[in-house]
């Protein structure tokens, strides 16, 4: 037997030994996966049972509170606070357990498990989401500038509007996945992206004509301003979140948002004038479009729908920001009154 053939045979035996070890390791891996699935099922059912009992207990406490003495009322209040705290713990637990997707994710992805099991994977996905927002904000800013000052063609406007639709659709999907993994983004700042997706889609279908041309430059100027404000928000919010996480005051899955939240009060109040300016520009867009919808040359249904959508965006953004600012001022006023 030649030396080369002997060497091949020796390598094969070495590979055979490694393969046997690999098979054993893979067997253990599958066994651990089955154990993990069993533990996940056990935890999920236990949490559901606990939540049901806590819900019943909360209703009972509410009935008891009506006829309780002062001492009993304090006990009821303490127990209610403990229940609220326990519910927050369950929320954190469920972030590491498989769960049914919401309606939106089911429609887009189907019944696929999107739960990330490690903190490292969750944070990596959140970080990638933030980078996606930053890069697309810069691209949209450049696109809006190009369409406003250089490319005066309907086809380039359609490309820009299609990019907006794709951007907001992608944001809603990624945010839904992050919410499934324990991110606490909620309320209007989630709905805001669904409304923006709809608005961008209607803009995409608006045919070229005199009415479109009357609104085109105003919309592109608004898009430029909005992208600049979003870039500022991302840049400063990210630094603020990093500092608050280091102090243990924020969750590691908290996200930057296109608005104002209570945690931004320290260090980011300088953004408020820009935000309110953007909100009132949305109102200005709505008023302009309502006027254009009554123009004698207007035949497109998109004009009135866009006007109504811009009005919804203004009301949602303005009232939510105002609510946060008012609540924070009330809280600060309460602190100053305390001896």
UniProtKB/Swiss-Prot annotation:
Pfam families: TMEM120A-B
Gene: TMEM120B
Subcellular location, record wording: Nucleus inner membrane
Protein name, entry field: Transmembrane protein 120B
Subunit structure, as described in the record: Heterooligomer with TMEM120A.
InterPro entries on file: TMEM120A/B
Keyword Thylakoid applies: no
S-S bonds: none
Cellular component annotations (GO), alphabetically ordered: nuclear inner membrane
Organism the protein comes from: Homo sapiens (Human)
Main location: nucleus
Primary role: Necessary for efficient adipogenesis. Does not show ion channel activity.
GO biological-process terms attached to the record: fat cell differentiation; protein heterooligomerization
Database matches in PANTHER family: TRANSMEMBRANE PROTEIN 120B, TRANSMEMBRANE PROTEIN INDUCED BY TUMOR NECROSIS FACTOR ALPHA
Transmembrane regions: 102-124, 132-152, 159-179, 187-207, 270-290, 302-322
UniProt KW keywords: Coiled coil, Membrane, Nucleus, Transmembrane, Transmembrane helix
């Amino acid at each position: 037997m030649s030396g080369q053939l002997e060497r091949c045979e020796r390598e094969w035996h070495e590979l055979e030994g490694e393969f046997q070890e690999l098979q054993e390791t893979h067997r253990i891996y599958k066994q651990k996966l089955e154990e993990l699935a069993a533990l996940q099922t056990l935890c999920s059912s236990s949490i559901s049972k606990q939540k049901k009992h806590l819900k019943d207990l909360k209703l009972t406490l509410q009935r008891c509170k009506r006829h309780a003495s002062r001492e009993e009322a304090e006990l009821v209040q303490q127990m209610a606070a403990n229940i609220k705290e326990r519910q927050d713990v369950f929320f954190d637990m469920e972030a590491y357990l498989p769960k049914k997707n919401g309606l939106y994710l089911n429609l887009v992805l189907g019944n696929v498990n999107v739960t990330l099991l490690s903190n490292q994977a969750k944070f990596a996905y959140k970080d990638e989401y933030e980078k996606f927002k930053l890069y697309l904000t810069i691209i949209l800013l450049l696109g809006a500038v190009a369409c406003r000052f250089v490319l005066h063609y309907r086809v380039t406007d359609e490309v820009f509007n299609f990019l907006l639709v794709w951007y907001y659709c992608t944001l809603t999907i990624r945010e839904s996945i992050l919410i499934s993994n324990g991110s606490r983004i909620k309320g209007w700042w989630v709905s805001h992206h669904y409304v923006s997706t709809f608005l961008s889609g209607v803009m995409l279908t608006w045919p070229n004509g005199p009415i479109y041309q009357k609104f085109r430059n105003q919309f592109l100027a608004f898009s430029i301003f909005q992208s600049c404000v979003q870039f500022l928000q991302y840049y400063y919010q990210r630094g603020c979140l990093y500092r608050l996480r280091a102090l243990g005051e924020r969750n590691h899955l908290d996200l930057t948002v296109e608005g104002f939240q209570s945690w931004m009060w320290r260090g980011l109040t300088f953004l408020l004038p820009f935000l309110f300016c953007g909100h009132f520009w949305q109102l200005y867009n709505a008023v302009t479009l309502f006027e254009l919808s009554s123009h004698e040359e207007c035949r497109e249904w998109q004009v009135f729908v866009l006007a109504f959508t811009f009005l919804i965006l203004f009301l949602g953004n303005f009232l939510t920001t105002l609510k946060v600012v008012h609540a924070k001022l009330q809280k600060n006023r309460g602190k100053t009154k305390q001896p």
